[in-house]
């Protein structure tokens, strides 16, 4: 679009009015300025993630990049306000609802009540991990394959996002590095 717009604006056969050409030129300039601001903010996020020890540990988790790590730390700090990883996941709205009657439990969809931005970041990260599952640690890859064999891909993605949030909580609260899940050997 950047290369085609000047040609379109100068093309006499299109019979564009002068005011329309001026408007399009102004919009192109605004787009260039917004793109430059986005690139600058991306550089700031990358720099912040490299300088922050918690961010460095978080980015070791599959599906968690600099944007997700910095957003999580900005929102929850060291996550010590949450007693368990499940509480953090619930705060983000990534835990399933539950309906039970007559001693039978039924899990429902996620609540979507928490931090929408963080929930979206973790779900998109989980989506990329599921798409690249063959490149993941053997334990995680095996778990994903088993889940995908039993249920819909979107359910697996949300389940993985929940798991990633819990991993992030553990990394932040325990001040440890991420350890990939190991496939248990059964005889």
List PLM regions with ranges.
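A residue-level signal for conserved active-site and pocket-lining positions in enzyme catalytic cores
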Residues: 34, 122, 164
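Short capping/connector residues at structural and topological boundaries
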Residues: 10, 14, 87, 99, ...
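Short helix-capping/linker segments at secondary-structure and domain boundaries
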Residues: 38, 77-81, 127-137, 165-180
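Low-complexity, acidic/Ser/Thr- and charged residue-rich accessory regions of DNA metabolism proteins
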Residues: 103, 141-187
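Glycine-rich, often acidic, oxyanion-interacting loops/wings at catalytic, nucleic-acid
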Residues: 1-57, 182-185
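Hydrophobic (often cysteine-bearing) scaffold residues that line and stabilize catalytic clefts
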Residues: 30, 37, 64, 114, ...
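Phosphate-backbone recognition surface of nucleic-acid-processing proteins
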Residues: 57-60, 66, 70-149, 153
């Amino acid at each position: 679009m950047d290369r085609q717009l000047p040609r379109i604006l100068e093309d006499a056969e299109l019979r564009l009015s002068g005011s329309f050409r001026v408007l399009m030129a102004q919009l192109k300039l605004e787009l260039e300025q917004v793109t430059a601001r986005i690139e600058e903010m991306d550089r700031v996020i990358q720099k912040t993630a490299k300088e922050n020890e918690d961010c460095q540990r978080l980015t070791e988790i599959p599906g968690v990049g600099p944007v997700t790590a910095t957003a999580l730390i900005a929102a929850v700090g060291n996550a010590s306000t949450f007693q368990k990883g499940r509480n953090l996941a619930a705060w983000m709205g990534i835990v399933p609802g539950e309906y039970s009657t007559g001693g039978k439990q039924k899990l429902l969809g996620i609540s979507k009540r928490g931090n929408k931005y963080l929930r979206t970041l973790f779900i998109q990260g989980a989506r990329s991990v599921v798409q690249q599952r063959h490149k993941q640690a053997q334990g995680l890859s095996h778990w994903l394959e088993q889940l995908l064999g039993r249920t819909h891909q979107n359910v697996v993605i949300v389940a993985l996002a929940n798991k990633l949030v819990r991993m992030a909580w553990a990394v932040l609260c325990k001040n440890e590095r991420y350890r990939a899940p190991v496939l248990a050997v059964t005889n």
